[in-house]
Amino acid sequence: MTLQQPDAIEVRGARVHNLKDIDIDIPLGKLVGIAGVSGSGKSSLALGVLYAEGSRRYLEALSTYTRRRLTQAEHAQVDEVLHVPAALALHQRPSVPGVRSTFGTMTELNNSLRLLFSRCAHHVCPHCGARVEPSLNVAAGLSLTCPSCGREFYAPDAESLAFNSGGACPTCGGTGVMREVDEASLVPDESKTINEGAVLPWGTLMWDLMKQVAGEMGVRTDVPFNQLTAHERDIVFHGPAVKKHILYVPKNGEGATPLDFTYYNAVYTVENALAKVKDDKGLKRVARFLREGPCRDCGGTRLSEVARQPQVCGINLAQAAAMTLGEAIEWVRGVPATLPTEMQPMAADICDSFLSTARRLVDLGLDYLALDRAGATLSTGERQRVQLARVVRNRSTGVLYVLDEPSIGLHPANVDGLVGVMRDLVADGNTVVVVDHDTRVLTEADYLVEMGPVAGAGGGNVIAAGSVDEVERAQASRIAPFLRTDPKRVRPQVADDEMFDQGHIRMATGAIHTVKPLKVDIPRGRLVAVTGVSGSGKTTLVLETLIPALKAQAAGERLPSHVRWVDAEGIARANLIDATPIGANVRSTVATYADIHDELRRAFARTPEAKAAGYKAGAFSYNTGALRCPTCDGTGSISLDVQFLPDVEIVCPACRGSRYAEAASHIHREGKDGSLLTLPQLMDMSVDEALDATVGLKKVQTRLQTLHDLGLGYLTLGEPTPALSGGEAQRLKLASEMGRVQDDAVFVFDEPTIGLHPLDVQVLLAVFDGLVAKGATVIVIEHDLDLIRNADYVIDMGPGGGDAGGQIVCAGTPDDIAACAKSITGRYL
């Protein structure tokens, strides 16, 4: 008798987050797409059920001793999940790597390069400096003999060539950058006297009395700084640390105090403050006086002089790492043929390991990135594709891969490569579940599951499931109308001759990263999309150039060194609205972030019951108030420490997640229909429900209406903000900006359609319209064709990525871009 192999993961009774006790079969060995509007339960099904159960069961198969050293998942809220394979998840937002991470280290390409330069290089004799021919002795762990001086030495191993260990530059510690005091920033206004605060660090980083000490040093403190002699200026910037006797008079003029005080010159004041920095806040205070540049010893390569000595084909490791991936592939292919015959098989093995890793990265459109590019400067989409390439390289089988929006940051031209990589995973015998909104990804799925019909409490149901054709025919489907249609325009088009009616924002830049020197002209008071393939320079142009330049001009500070000039008269604010999570812990909720909770606390403190009990507004705070739950301290949950098992996070049994003590349920406020509501009940309502329940509270109503208009009506007031999706976080950050006059503001959104269903994109466009109607200039970095089609003006970067990009290919209306033969974006519009 032959046992029939299971052909599907059977999910029964799933209740994670907003899932409504759903039953669904997910085909095994297929590419499965999960669609649905934001907040409909897609990630709850994919990550909260499939991944959570797949990874938990795999870990449970390990020994107790091993499990104690791993972060473990708790049981998902589901009756049964059958036939689920071991699972791996690629999350929507991989963490930003630290300062020591580069594209080469993240992809492990550096490992192959270091091995190549250790085993196959011409090494330098440490005794006489002569070069020694490549030899198999290095791989065998034997010494090399110098042909010039005859002495023996050992070649560096691969670890000795790593900038994170033995090969690090001693000056910068392997980071490649040095922070130095920028003397020009110490005295920005030389028309002021020292007494008037000309020397900024003495006023912001040091006691004000340093002005008096400078006077005792022989510096005139009552004349404009630009009239000081060269000797006096030298004392201000570089004077010696000597003790001086001063009579300190406090600002209130009471009681002069004699003091002996050591003189700290302006440069040392900054250096001393930098040495004492303990957190980002402290660094921010000092950063304005610092200039960051390449390390003077290693030239930014991160490597020590010894690590830069071995050469392969005439170049060293630093020069190889400076190549783009595309260039490095060509170079690596040619290496084995240049070596002695007996070394070629070993070199070929090392080179093959590099090339097999590189091939996946090229498929995902990352060939434009230099291997030494700092990991922190990679975009979200680039980091996610690096993560995906690492997974595919393993060639494992029988695994469930859950991908959360892998199309983030992916230009339409790169979608085919992404689909190809997912198909390779399926071909290796794996199951791929992909949560995405990109219809070009969804239409490639073998099986499609659509969640909905709406977000939040009204969602959590399977409204369609089957092949793409079957979902298209499903009456209840909300994605069906978008699956095979071209992007449509829903906003009125601004006439060409009216585009710049409200003014210009102009800027000229020098070269930076892959961006060539260029001039850009942006219409004010319009919705402007910055487009282009990955690596074309969009992020560099907008986030690293335009925003810092506008902020510097508004603050009257020096422009970034690569910005030649900027003309943006009347712009006082440049706001980046990104998708990073809001708040660091569960104490931050939608109500507290949107400034609704304080108003609600005051409203409940005015009730007769609160007055009778002696409760003021502060008592209703779930963080510090008298009415917070004493069991969970107002977090709504408690963590149980179970030895040998993972800590179990459970809803607080005392307050049942409301965060409040029992006494809070005795304080009522009358609602619209005469019903009595408590604050815990209100916090458990959605924004839309609370709109009806808070009639009469004008400020609360205004803020709730704003959240509704932002498409966030389904969020509950007590929902922790760190749990919000990227798109939800972005829109919530806008809440405080809506309704204000914005003609002095520029709002920049980095891929605001992340996590948005095509229907949600239409809501987002309405939000942008609201900002533009108030005079704001809205700039979006975007790949989503629906949003690009609806922009007033498009600036298309390219034509390619990396060195093949960095230029403005064309600028104009979406129709102009579509008609531009050189624009890759235009082909898809």
Regions found by a protein language model. Give the residues of each.
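Conserved phosphate-binding elements of NTP-dependent enzyme cores
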Residues: 1-829
